């Protein structure tokens, strides 16, 4: 009887020892996504029909069909800038992507078209011919970063959030304060 209990205890100990591993866990650092900026410049002296066609061709070529990811920096003549902004808005470029700088009454106009490109990280393959210990510890984060870099609409968003302003939480505390003081609707 005791021999059977000892055999069961040894089997239980061996199975529990296999579940607990003292080997260090190596966590691979996340692979960064690199964002590259590409700029092209167009200078216009007037806004005749030929210049307007040059502007439209320039915007189409610079955007590569992705007008929502094209950022324009327009400087120079305020009258020509207004015409260029109007043409860009008609092409579908968002107002938040058009920036006016150094407006004056001089004769020429400078339009800089900026496009951002995300360069996805190079990940090792999850399928391997050799089944070693690292095969089961492949980093999932690298493939997630790769997919994000490939699918993101405007890679400039990876550089930082320019729409949400940082705050100290005072606005978020207003509903809690209202609830605690019972001055809101349904207060007792």
From Swiss-Prot:
Enumerate the NCBIfam families for this protein: pilus_cpaD
Q: Which organism is it from?
A: Sinorhizobium fredii (strain NBRC 101917 / NGR234)
Q: What PROSITE patterns does the entry give?
A: PROKAR_LIPOPROTEIN (PS51257)
| Lineage of producing organism | Bacteria, Pseudomonadati, Pseudomonadota, Alphaproteobacteria, Hyphomicrobiales
Q: Name one GO cellular component term.
A: plasma membrane
- Supply the name of the protein: Uncharacterized lipoprotein y4xK
Claim: Iron is one of the keywords in the record:
no
What keywords does the record list, in alphabetical order? Cell membrane, Lipoprotein, Membrane, Palmitate, Plasmid, Signal
The record's section on InterPro entries has: Pilus_biogenesis_CpaD-related, Pilus_CpaD
Keyword Transferase recorded: no
Leader peptide range in chain numbering: 1-18
Q: Where in the cell is it found?
A: Cell membrane
């Amino acid at each position: 009887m005791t021999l059977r209990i000892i055999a069961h205890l040894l089997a239980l100990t061996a199975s529990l020892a296999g579940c607990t591993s003292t080997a260090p866990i190596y966590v691979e650092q996340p692979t960064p996504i690199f964002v590259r900026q590409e700029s092209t410049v167009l200078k216009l002296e007037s806004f005749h029909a030929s210049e307007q066609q040059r502007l439209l061709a320039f915007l189409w070529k610079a955007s590569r069909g992705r007008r929502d990811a094209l950022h324009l920096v327009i400087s120079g003549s305020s009258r020509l800038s207004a015409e260029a902004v109007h043409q860009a808005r008609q092409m579908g470029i968002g107002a938040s992507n058009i920036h006016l700088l150094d407006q004056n009454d001089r004769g020429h106009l400078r339009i800089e078209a900026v496009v951002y490109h995300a360069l996805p990280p190079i990940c090792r393959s999850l399928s391997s011919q050799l089944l070693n210990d690292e095969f089961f510890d492949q980093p999932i984060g690298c493939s997630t970063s790769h997919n994000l870099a490939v699918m993101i609409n405007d890679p400039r968003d990876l550089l930082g959030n320019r729409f949400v302003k940082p705050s100290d939480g005072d606005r978020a505390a207003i509903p809690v304060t209202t609830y605690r003081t019972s001055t809101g609707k349904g207060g007792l």
